Amino acid sequence: MQAHGGWNALFWCNHDQPRAVSRFGSDTTYWKESAEMLAVAIHFMRGTPYIYQGEELGMTNPHFTSIDQYRDVESLNYYKILRQQDKSEEETLDIIAQRSRDDSRTPMQCDASENAGFTTGTPWIGIADNYKAINAAAQMDAPDSIRSFYKTLVALRKKMPVISAGKIEFLYPDNADLLAYRRYDGETELLVLCNLREREIAKPLPVGWTDAEKLLGNYPDTADTLRPYECVVLKK
């Protein structure tokens, strides 16, 4: 695609997929770290990154506990199929909770008030159980919030042509724990490293990158390894 000038649509979330931070990261212990790592993973790629509503806040799956809370017809039908296959109620709800399209269809979490500030009426579907902590108002003026991190990503993409127009080379394709790639345009080079696991992994640096400048990361300091869901962007 790159060789012929192709252009990708880059996204984790949409109205038919579970929330990325719950699906590919951690929506508990490493919620912030994994949400920011997933953002870096695609926002430094070649193409157009999409931000689905609430993704910039780290919105999670809603953690529904009853089938009565779901509205998605596929989820309701799949519930019946799983129960007919003698899956227990607990196991069935666990499967639905991980896969349902309703995971990304709950109202936008605006603030900590009733119905997450989305409406004074009755929403057609329930609100995620963590809306009092995860909402736009809580992050609006917080410099260390996920929302602020997204603003930094957008600003860097506008400022640095290598991100929007440079070439991309993926590295270490056999390492399932790591997403790594290089961006370059003849003037600037970037190295993007993303730990996809909830554990520490090795931090491989190609030749010539040991003394590179740290452009961005989701941990305040620098380590010789990649910590759980850590992302690092180096520049030279």
Give residue spans per PLM region.
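Active-site and adjacent substrate-binding regions of carbohydrate-active enzymes
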Residues: 1-209, 213-236
